[in-house]
């Protein structure tokens, strides 16, 4: 059975015209995470943010179920497998809510995904997906 999570990055700019603020995502280690089909398997990606002013970052996923990072992978037949996502590098591990961050030359973030459901012989084979969205507001 193949399980994967596709990472999509979006930057949202909300800056003033008088001063051109700069904020960018750099050093993305992987745009697609692949989990093995074993219980508690993990996958992670990291990236850095450089901003010349204070900013906010928001993490969300297509299948997010709560603010603590519970989500699920889904296959083409809508069968679901639960996952848990965690953020490190931010001032909080909060999902679907902007997290204020100070201006920095480089702030490293890591998103870790863990399979929280044990696949069995009865688990339908297929490609299981979720999408992660990262928004920068500056």
Feature map (PLM): residue ranges:
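Cleavable N-terminal signal peptides
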Residues: 7-8, 18
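N-terminal signal peptide c-region/cleavage motif recognized by signal peptidases
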Residues: 13-17
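Extended rod-forming repeat segments used as scaffolds/tethers
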Residues: 9-11, 137
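N-terminal small/polar-rich segments of proteins
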Residues: 19-75, 101-138
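Surface-exposed binding patches on compact interaction domains or structured appendages
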Residues: 62-98
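Positively charged n-region of N-terminal signal peptides that target proteins for export
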Residues: 1-5
């Amino acid at each position: 059975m193949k399980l994967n999570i596709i990472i999509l990055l979006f930057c949202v700019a909300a800056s003033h015209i008088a001063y051109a603020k700069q904020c960018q995502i750099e050093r993305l280690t992987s745009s697609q995470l692949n989990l093995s089909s074993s219980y508690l398997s993990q996958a992670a990606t990291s990236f850095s943010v450089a901003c010349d002013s204070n900013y906010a970052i928001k993490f969300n996923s297509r299948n997010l179920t709560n603010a603590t990072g519970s989500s699920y992978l889904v296959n083409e037949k809508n069968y679901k497998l639960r996952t848990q996502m965690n953020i490190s590098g931010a001032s909080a591990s909060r999902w679907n809510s902007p997290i204020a961050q100070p201006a920095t030359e480089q702030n490293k973030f890591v998103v870790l995904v863990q399979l929280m459901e044990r696949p069995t012989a009865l688990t339908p084979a297929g490609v299981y997906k979720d999408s992660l969205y990262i928004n920068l507001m500056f």
